[in-house]
């Protein structure tokens, strides 16, 4: 059974339909990318999975449980970590306190120090800035902090929305290197990313979303070599 199974979800904003029968799945150990142009429905898909939006029809099943109507705080407790577009940090709190905000749903408080150490191992720059206000960090450091905060919940699935947006190429490389490391340590990842080449390069599988509908799916390598994908998203 897939860890996450999204089946035929339809989502509306008022009278505007944002998602049209979207279906996708994620298995244990996978990185799955969701690519598409701006306004295609990628962020809405993540928000619907995490309980920030709700589908009018269709189902979202996570770890064997139907979470279609679950509020966001329940999906966090179920094991879904979501690092949203725009990072959504607490700018007047220090780095360490932002990380601690990711632990609010945890019952195993004893494991928190080791998980903070793990985040600092993944992102040494955060350790150097542990007492610095989040609002004074660079864009790349803020993205590291957003990912680290999501990891502090010990998610069974990590969802990332545009992790490389606005970052310099060298920081983009760092973020993607760490994502593959997180995945290699056992955490599945659902990745929405405007840099389609990088996303498909690290993804085991991927979906292409256009105007709210899935129009193509395959392995990352298959979509990298697809003429349609190359023309529309890879600038070839």
In which residue ranges do the predicted regions lie?
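Glycine-rich phosphate-binding loops of nucleotide-dependent enzymes
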Residues: 2-236
